[in-house]
């Protein structure tokens, strides 16, 4: 209906906000707080949250939130004039509060302990820790890149873009000696290679990729070409 939400009005007035991240334990209360209560109604009380004073800004923090960010509003960018167009609020974090219960043994935030949720469309939300998986980051290494992968691998219908990304993330292609030793010590790979069936060979390599073993996948794929 093109009305302005109280959050935006408060941002424009105070030029300060607190961003409280939402985890699964508080999602129902957060949903309740999104009710269009009249201006002036204390939504902390309505949602059953605990308001605690901030240190560097005027707005209160939500005690139940595992991470609270005190922010100064730098810019408000209108994304349109029609109903539902929205606004982009650019903020500077001036104080960060982290509940130590969400930290792992290394002092970093554990994605399982923080148990974040995200808002989707309609009534739908997503619980982050139920969809966790790891992707190795090439921060300390220099991957050879997909462009260095032979065409017979890149053009195969068996390998996905993710598979090619894994193959391209190794630092060096295995040597002939490394491949020979690998094949010699692996009877299953020997059997697949003896069939000379390219599809079966590539499927075997894909098994290694599915198990996050790109180096062995390379050895399977190149074995026949170094004999």
PLM regions: where:
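Basic, polyanion-binding surface patches
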Residues: 1-227
